[in-house]
Amino acid sequence: MEAKTFFLFMLFIFSQSWLSTSKRILNNPSVFSSSLNFSSGNAERLIKSFNLMPKYDVNVIPKGSLDAPRLIERQIDFLATAGSKNASVGPSVQEFGHYAGYYSLPHSKSAKMFYFFFESRNKTTDPVVIWLTGGPGCSSSVAMFYENGPFKISKDLSLYWNDFGWDKVSNIIYVDQPVGTGFSYTSDESDIRNDEDGVSNDLYDFLQAFFKEHPKFVKNDFFITGESYAGHYIPALASRVHSGNKKKEGIPINLKGFAIGNGLTNPEIQYGAYGDYALQMKLISESDHESLKQDYVECQNITKKCSLGGGLVCDSAVEVCTSIFNKIVAKKSGLNYYDIRKKCVGSLCYDFSRMEIFLNKENVRKALGVGDIKFVSCSSTVYDAMIEDWMQNLEVKIPSLVNDGINLLVYAGEYDLICNWLGNSRWVDQMNWSGQKGFGSAKNVSFLVDGKEAGLLKNHGPLTFLKVYNAGHMVPMDQPKASLQMLQNWMQGKLRTTPVLGFSQ
């Protein structure tokens, strides 16, 4: 794969040889070199066919090999750095606090976590939002530049204001995590995380340091958001924050809610929806559907074993269950499984190369304080290190949160196959919590944007589900205005079964 290419989410798809590679990575430090070799040609061809093998495996920096940046936070002016022709169009960057920084993780040998922070274009009392991109191992800069960040990237690599950036209604943080993702790095491979305990503890430590650095935001409402594999990260972090607050471990974090977009949260239920969704969208035949039902029985059984015991059986669960997805994709040549309306043209279904080129420019790296570190958009080593986490059910962490009044929004674009709305709606419906019966009997109502139907909404108490029309896996990219209205209404407690006609800009 060429240096400019990468793939955004790398969910679900690999062969048995790819699974066995996880053991070699974790037991062989030589794997943490600038390239990753696979013993099986078939595995490599499969992975490349789905754009799952980034060129750069992970940012593991040998000790003493470069003058790695120390823990810093600095104010940045992206528009000036990019030499943007239209820098004068829109608000002045100087009006807001735009920051980039590193956080030295305390429970690691040498890990540094990179982040961006953008103060609200509206007012500093707006909620604080953290965004987590999935993968696992994909940089949150993907969302920042192509979905809901303050800026978009032009063809000439200049930047321009995003009219529907989430910083219009929130003070927003984008974190490169787990360690080894994006500009985050370590000099010791043992810092690479392999489960949600490690990931959520690192993020909790980061948030403690963030609020210590920015005390004026401590009392603001706080929301956790993200998409795709962040369907694992988000419940784990919400649970960790809630637990830390209860135990008075540090600075109280004013957690009000968490939102999962087209996420992977309960694999056992969601894999069962693949065949039904594919049939509904005419991707497969009735006979294909019947065959997939049998495959799902095996998937369901082994996923239950994974949830009970973890370990190697979870590797096997990924192999067994992803065969369902692979069989569907094989039926439609060139299918973009993140948006089934579109063709996956060329080597990538989406071209996000502008971001990699921009962030690897010398003047940009200098402005961000990242030294000579090469930007890694999606890390195959981080992805592989989390392999035994994939089939774990993170829904189990949610009932105690919503029962305590912490709001949950699950939203999904209707044309995404890989984390489809049907599978997400099923685990939400089946979740055992105090309001399950009330949610089950709640009516669906239209979600309106500018007076037009933009989705279908269901709500009861702290739980909301939203099916977003005319969107795929990345809702803020496909429906930027609707996603901004969704966020604002939800944070204000207005994303309810009573239609909301508009939002304030």
Swiss-Prot record:
Belongs to the peptidase S10 family. GO terms for biological process: proteolysis. It is found in: Secreted. Glycans are attached at N37, N86, N122, N301, N432, N444. Disulfide bonds join C138-C378, C306-C321, C344-C349. InterPro entries: AB_hydrolase_fold, Peptidase_S10, Ser_caboxypep_his_AS, Ser_caboxypep_ser_AS. One of its GO terms (molecular function) is serine-type carboxypeptidase activity. Probable carboxypeptidase. The active site is at S228, D416, H473. GO terms for cellular component: extracellular region. Residues 1-22 form the signal peptide. Keywords: Carboxypeptidase, Disulfide bond, Glycoprotein, Hydrolase, Protease, Secreted, Signal. The lineage of its organism: Eukaryota, Viridiplantae, Streptophyta, Embryophyta, Tracheophyta. Pfam families: Peptidase_S10. The keyword Nucleotidyltransferase does not apply. Expressed in roots, flowers and siliques. Its main location: secreted. This is Serine carboxypeptidase-like 47. Its EC number is 3.4.16.-. The gene is SCPL47.
